Amino acid sequence: MELKLNRKYKDTLFRKVFNNKKDLLSLYNALNNTEHMDDSLITITTIEDAIYIGYKNDISFIINSELNLYEHQSSVNPNMPVRGLIYFAELYKGYIDQNNLLIYNERIVKMPFPRYVVFYNGTEEQPEEQELRLSDSFVQVPEGEGLKDTAGTEADKTNKPSVEVVVQLLNINYGCNQELMEKCQKLMEYSKFIALVRVKSDMLTEKYKKEMKSVNKKEIFAEAVALAIDEAIRDNVLKDILSKNMAEVTDMLLTEFDEKAYIDGVKKQSYEEGEAIGEDKLARLVVELKKRGRVEDIAKVTDEGERERLYREFNI
């Protein structure tokens, strides 16, 4: 099965909500416990004409000598620090070019301080806050093979990497991070609206199930979005955005729905392919062990660590 997704980038609702400096400043203040009032302090640096790893970063901006990268995600991706590395490299390159900084000069070049925040509102249970690190992706250097200092001793037994990216992952599902929500009205309203869409979707799914009607998930979701928009406008939730951009918001959410369905499909396909490969490897391992009369080791293959050790031993 070949899975396809239209890679033409469309704005997310999150980016739409925070596309003006006033609301973006409110979000920044809430995250950093600051009280800036002048939104002219913000310089938008979002890369508008490039898509990295199939996805464009949502919002990046400079304020107070800080380079902030904000991104919305409906699934937790452990490779977000890798994406962050690529984003920041491009953003800093642009900053150096724009400011005519001489990086080959003897004088140190001053750069804005990086901050990377990902706002998560998927359906999987996640803690309110967590950190993801680029160093978790690095292959660890075996003990004793670290850098040596001039005396020939190990300079750093922990083999600290030369590059690091830290992602602050915040759960913004309704009911999470209440203190943050209370400091940023727009974030609270965004969280409420997404929760409302899900409630309507669950309600319609149950309704059509009872009525024994055959309605596909996307049609149910589209109807749920329409109902949620009407109710949100009545309740003054994102009213300014929803009332003026109803069709655009609907299109954004349906696009996000398609992307989620695509990602879920890729995960399922990868899992099935992985299972098939795993079964083949295991069968080959058992054959090798039987050939060598190592019956006691066959019982050990149920342990993942032992299994991986045996794979390496037999180069499988």
Per-range role (PLM):
Residues 1-316:
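Elongated, amphipathic alpha-helical interaction scaffolds
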